[in-house]
Amino acid sequence: MSSPFRVHGALSRGVLAVAVLISLAVLFAPPSDVPDSPPGVDKLVHLLLFATLAVSGRWAGVGRGVLAGLLVLYAAGSELLQATDLVGRDASVGDLLADVVGVLLGLTAWAAWAGRNRATAH
């Protein structure tokens, strides 16, 4: 019987889907739903959110380059949409940078984990 944690399995695709849904809720919540927090916490949330998207995307089998490109476009698009009347929040270059750092950290974490697992499998 195969492990439910194997790469490209149903569990990995489900985790990616949940991560995307959570990101939509976090990034596009109306201003009244965004809790007050100490300075910098929003950047940490962005970083962790995009790191999670990167790790879950790699686990689901999305290629590194494709995933990085899509996530950076998603980050930029989300910031642009936040500045519209549709969402009513402010666009932030700082949030975009935190998103990109999160993508890079997530991809790096996945590469380290996958490399270690390949080494122990031999």
Named regions from a protein language model:
Residues M1-L96, V100, L104-H122:
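Bulky hydrophobic segments
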